[in-house]
Amino acid sequence: MRFDCFAQNLHDMSVLKHIWGDVERHFLASTSCSGLSFPGLTTVNQSQISIRSIVPNMAQLFSYTACRQLSQMFLAVIFFHGSEYILAVGIHGRSNVTLKSLLISKHYLLAMVFSLLEYCVEIILFPGLKEHWWISNLGLAMVIIGEIIRKMAIITAGQSFTHLIRTHPSEHHRLITNGIYRLVRHPGYCGFFIWSVGTQIMLCNPISTIAFALVVWRFFAQRIPYEEYFLRQFFGSQYEEYGRRIPSGVPFVK
């Protein structure tokens, strides 16, 4: 008997819920058609509608697209910085290498966090934006190419390659003009520029792609002339002649 009463109550509540839903829909339709406005009620319903439209899209964060693109991003970042540190230890020795060789700074972390936030917001609000696989694959190719160019630069230069600009000559420092350095003067910078922009194209992040390109380019546009001032001091006419023949490797930087 109690079970029958409980079932009847559930049935009545379900009927009332449907009736209330119909009444609410008809009421909102009539007020919108008649031009009546109820600011508080309208605001609440608009917020509910917007939330209801966003919440289902939260699942996009766990979709195949997000898992693939984000995993590629994390693997690219881990490999880049891990290999930088390993090569630095192998070339210069453990005692001469610090955690700065990982090339991770506060500004770099902020940029990466911003790019991830952009990705999460866009895949929730505009999931179709991330489905342009030819763009994402182009970015992946840029990441691989940039990685190869930079690592070739490090291996070719050997002990002449450091993460800090030399302001004083060293016994191990010599002018490298062979290998990848026959094509560009600063293949390490060229590789990083391609790699960093490629990570954002791989994520189909339009805002971060432009931001990364501008910020990284501006950094190298200031760094290269400063570094080459000392290279001319160290190698004189030899570097002057090399600089005239070979491009810098960074677009629009002589």
Question: What residue spans do the PLM features occupy?
Answer:
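Membrane-anchoring alpha-helices and their flanking helix-loop junctions
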Residues: R2-T177, I194-K254
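Histidine-centered phosphotransfer motif of kinases
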Residues: T177-N178, R182-C190
